[in-house]
C-alpha cells in the first residue's frame, strides 16, 4: 500500500481511515470493491470497473449520491499522481458506514468510499493449481458480486496453499467450474479458448470481459475434470493480469504461445490510446 490514500474524498495517510465500529460494513462486510490495474499512470478499463461497481452496489442496496460516485475517477487520477504511480494497482471500496439497526437505535445513513493504491502484485513464476473442496452457491444473493465478503475465497485459497498449491478451481453446487479462488479461469483445448459461463456463478471480471472482447472465446458449463484434458490453463484478474498455470495437481503444462499472454501489452496500448 502506498503512503497516501483517499477516504470520502479527502487525502489521508495510508492505513489510518476510521469507520464506524457498529456499521454494517464492520459487522457484516456490507460493501463492494473493485481492483484496477494501472498502466503508464492511467487506470485500465475504468469504465468497466465503474459500471460493475455501480451494478454491484445496487445489488446489495448500497446507494451513494450520484455526484459522489461520478467523482471517483477524478479522485483516483489525483491519487495516482500524488503517489507517483507508473504501473501498479488501485482498490476502490464502497461500504455501508451506517450503524447496524441490530446494535444502534439511530444512525445517519451513509456510504463510505476508500481508495488505496499499491505496487503491482508479485506472482510466482511456477503456479500450481488444484481443485478446492469448497463449493460456490450459484443461487446465493452474492454470487457473481465482488463484495467485501471475501472470507470464503480466502479460506479456499489458504486450504490450497496448505496442500502446496497456489490456486484452486472452485465448482458450484452442481459441480460446474466457476473460477479460481481469487481469479477468473480460461483454458485452451487445441486452438479453442474457453471460460466458465456467468450462469455458473462466476465473477463477471473486468479482465474476463476484456478478453472476451478481444479473443475468440467460448463461455461454457463444464465439470472440473474437463480441465484435466486442457492444453493450457490461465488465471486472470486486474491485479495479476494473465498468468499461465504450470501444474494442475500432478500434471505439468508446457509454456503456451497463445496471444492471450500478450494481454498486458495490448492493455497498455489501449490505455495509451484512450488517454490521447
Provide a role label for each language-model segment.
Residues 1-78, 95, 100-276:
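Helix-start/capping segments and mature chain N-termini
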